[in-house]
Amino acid sequence: MNERFYPILATLAVLALLYGYGIFEHRAFSDTYVLGALLTDNAFLIITAVGMTFVILSGGIDLSVGSMIAFIGVLMAELVTGFGMHPLMAALISLIVGAAFGAFMGVIIAKFDIQPFIITLAGMFFLRGVCFLINLDSVPIDHPFVAAFSGFKVQLPGRGWLTASALLMLATVIGGVVIAHYTRFGRNVYAIGGDRHSAELLGIPVHSTIIRVYTLSGFFSALSGVVFAFYTASAYPLAAVGVELDAIAAVVIGGTLLTGGMGFVMGTFFGGIIMGVIQTLIAFDGSLNSWWTKIMIGALLFGFIVLQRLITRSFSGMRAGAT
């Protein structure tokens, strides 16, 4: 079997073990209610992580996504409650703004050859600051469409349901899979992350691809902000603090190499679900502090980073043997 599948197989094994343990310990864990809640509660994180997957596949990082979610929420609240705009129009404007800001960071990263870490860190601070310029307090988004979005449900067998947030997240994952594996852009992202110099020699448009990667990340984090705002029917400048780290964790647990060039969008989906399952198991237990979620996710990250290192060493050894 190709070694590039090892990380995602490890991800699936961890997910199966955790879910199996949950069903063994708590009979209610097998109810579709839990599955529906997992998909809904982690929808905005997984949408963000899909965009982060493309960034990490290209060999970059985007620390601005959490601040983008908060900014989009505050922007939408201002457009809907302050200017009387329909939420769908506000969402469209927000998506354009998010993609444009991502493109702006991508241009700086690509054209000036600056480390993505420092540029997206600047973007993180900038967007969070702008949130407080717009509004200092939590703002409710009171509109019939938002209420309808929050209340929309598709019944699953048993007691479970799929909400609008979960359905949008699943559509985003499918779209991400198509872009990553069935488009020239997706193949270019993998090539750049695998070996940027070789990609340039092959004539791949490295600069424009990187710009599009950060545009895509900005779009997906803006979409996550829209979903989060609709789901909570409110906006707050301090929303989604630390989500950028959770998104990176979901991508890594999902089997994408931090060095770039190897990974799967579906793996990111499973990584996000694993993080949700851990939170749910701790909630079901009742005797454990919520900080155990961070401890378990940290332990998983240690394991997956070591696995990634072993795989990259194996590939390096095969390349050396081939030469």
Regions found by a protein language model. Give the residues of each.
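Transmembrane helix-bundle core of multi-pass membrane transporters
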Residues: 116-182, 209-212, 232-240, 284-285, ...
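Transmembrane alpha-helical segments in multi-pass inner-membrane proteins
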Residues: 221, 231-298
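Alpha-helical transmembrane segments within multi-pass membrane transporters and channels
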Residues: 84-124, 270-275
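Helix-loop-helix "hairpin" substructures at the membrane interface of multi-pass membrane proteins
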Residues: 86-94, 100-105, 109, 156-235
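Hydrophobic alpha-helical segments embedded in the membrane of multi-pass proteins
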Residues: 41-51, 67, 71, 100-103, ...
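Structural signal for alpha-helical transmembrane segments and their membrane-water exit/capping regions
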Residues: 14-30, 58, 131-135, 177-184
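Single transmembrane alpha-helix segments in multi-pass membrane proteins
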Residues: 18-25, 31-83, 107-114, 251, ...
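Cytosolic-side transmembrane-helix boundaries in multi-pass membrane proteins
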Residues: 1-20, 24, 174-175, 201-208, ...
